[in-house]
A protein has these predicted regions:
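Positively charged, small/polar-rich N-terminal and surface patches that mediate targeting and assembly
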Residues: 1-96
Length: 96
């Protein structure tokens, strides 16, 4: 099974950060309307030498890869991001 992950940073160039309220609204408007299920993980990352809070949105099926690209493009536009990161891992996963 394939797991695709969208990783986004919460810094906004020259404008502070994506707040929890802004992130929750984005998830409600852009993620929940497009995905039936996903795993959302919060963490820290480094982009261009700067540490920042990140959010990873992962799905474990091949059908939703394009949906994550749409979500990533929406995030880039809404929060003026230079880039978002997509990663794909092949794993054996069982839902029991």
């Amino acid at each position: 099974m394939e797991t695709t992950t969208l990783t986004v940073g919460r810094n906004i160039k020259d404008s502070g950060t994506v707040t929890n309220q802004m992130l929750e609204q984005f998830i409600n408007d852009e993620v929940l309307t497009r995905l039936e299920y996903a795993t959302i993980t919060h963490g820290m990352g480094i982009y261009k030498g700067t540490m920042e809070a990140i959010v990873c949105i992962s799905v474990s099926d091949d059908k939703n890869e394009d949906v994550l690209f749409e979500v990533g493009e929406a995030y880039k536009k809404q929060f003026r991001q230079d880039a978002v990161m997509y990663s794909c891992d092949m794993r054996e996963v069982a839902f029991k």
